[in-house]
Swiss-Prot record:
InterPro entries found in the cross-reference section: FA_synthesis, Phospholipid_synth_PlsX-like
Entry superkingdom: Bacteria
Organism in which the protein naturally occurs: Nostoc punctiforme (strain ATCC 29133 / PCC 73102)
Reaction(s) catalysed (UniProt annotation): a fatty acyl-[ACP] + phosphate = an acyl phosphate + holo-[ACP]
Any one biological process term the GO annotation gives: fatty acid biosynthetic process
Function (record text): Catalyzes the reversible formation of acyl-phosphate (acyl-PO(4)) from acyl-[acyl-carrier-protein] (acyl-ACP). This enzyme utilizes acyl-ACP as fatty acyl donor, but not acyl-CoA.
Subunit structure: Homodimer. Probably interacts with PlsY.
UniProt subcellular location: Cytoplasm
Protein name according to UniProt: Phosphate acyltransferase
PANTHER family: FATTY ACID/PHOSPHOLIPID SYNTHESIS PROTEIN PLSX (PTHR30100), PHOSPHATE ACYLTRANSFERASE (PTHR30100:SF1)
Sorted UniProt keywords: Cytoplasm, Lipid biosynthesis, Lipid metabolism, Phospholipid biosynthesis, Phospholipid metabolism, Transferase
This protein's pathway: Lipid metabolism; phospholipid metabolism
Length: 340
């Protein structure tokens, strides 16, 4: 691509706060991370969102004629709006003009666009959306996948999620021999429905992963597992519930801080602790979820993402590119086929 710096295509029109917050987070990433940013979307809106006195010669804008709204049916919209910002961003990766893509827009549209334009990695039947959850062990997150790409999953898909998740956990999150669990209703091997039992057997027999058994709901945030696999229906419910619980806990802490003069003094001492709690629980700290299994680095952000989330998502995308996550996943499947 003519440059050693990581180039990231940003869907500047995707998200509740686009393009303003998207542009702000992207410019911060350009300055602090040394990445090259390609802002994809309506040039007039993007330029209007730039800070005053911005040197336009230093900002690369890739025009896109349309955007996909959150209420549109994703597959039809992606096919109908060929020049939509998410499609143009994906094309930049396909044409090797960008190393990764990020969008805080319609997650279904991002997945559909990635599949249609980039395709799947060899050996992967279904892509999965993987997101990072905090745990009770500081600095030890858990990667949960799938959290929304596949409502129904065959046991083989869950095995593939485990392989991909292990590669991401090891090479991006820095986990040594990631411990993999299967989300289930009990610890015993025989627990769960037929699909869960068969998935358990496949995971147990796969020598490419460090499968340590079933994970119950109470285990997800325990820090005992590094990767947890489940179907996208359960995973999405888990994700939305965890986000809601985090917001409730933070609100309760704010309401229960002591009142009055003594309370104000106490609150002054507690504020740094509250800030650290928020940082550990806030999804903005991780920025986005990686769409694993497609032939390109693709991060999907929360629709409500603001500049800090955008920055962190770009940081994670850069780490995924730098650590060659796609190549690592492919090599795992080559080894598996050879050993099989």
């Amino acid at each position: 691509m003519g440059s050693t710096r990581v180039r990231i295509a940003i869907d500047a029109m995707g998200g509740d706060h686009a393009p303003g917050e998207i542009v702000a987070g992207a410019l911060r990433a350009k300055e602090e991370l040394g990445v090259e940013i390609l802002l994809v979307g309506d040039p007039q809106q993007i330029e209007a969102a730039l800070p005053p006195k911005t040197n336009l010669a230093q900002v690369e804008i890739v025009p896109a004629e349309e955007a996909i709204a959150m209420d549109e049916e994703p597959l039809n919209a992606v096919r109908r709006k060929r020049k939509a910002s998410i499609n143009v961003a994906m094309d930049l990766v396909k044409q090797q003009k960008a190393d990764a893509v990020f969008s805080a827009g319609h997650s279904g549209a991002a997945m559909a666009s990635a599949l249609l334009r980039l395709g799947r990695l060899p050996g992967i039947d279904r892509p999965a959306i993987g997101t990072v959850f905090p745990t009770i062990v500081a600095g030890k997150p858990v990667l949960v996948l799938d959290v929304g790409a596949n409502v129904d999953c065959r046991p083989k898909f869950l095995e593939q999620f485990a392989v991909m998740g292990s590669a991401y956990s090891q090479y991006v999150l820095g986990t040594t021999e990631p411990k993999v669990g299967l989300l289930n209703i009990g610890e015993e091997d025989s627990k769960g429905n037929d699909a869960a039992v068969r998935a358990h057997q496949l995971l147990r027999e796969n020598s490419q992963i460090n499968f340590i058994g079933n994970a119950e709901g109470r285990d997800v945030l325990s820090g005992h597992f590094d990767v947890i696999v489940c179907d996208g229906f359960v995973g999405n419910v888990l994700l939305k519930f965890a986000e809601a619980v985090g917001e409730v806990i933070l609100q309760i802490l704010r309401e229960e801080l002591p009142q009055g003069l003594h309370g104000q003094i106490g609150s002054a001492f507690l504020k740094p602790n509250l800030k650290r709690v928020k940082q550990r629980m806030d999804h903005a700290e991780h920025g986005g979820a990686l769409l694993l299994g497609v032939a390109g680095v693709c991060f999907i952000g929360h629709g409500s993402s603001q500049a800090p989330s955008i920055f962190n998502a770009i940081r994670m995308a850069k780490e995924a590119v730098d650590n060659q996550v796609l190549q690592r996943i492919q090599s795992q499947y080559i080894l598996e086929r050879e050993s099989g």
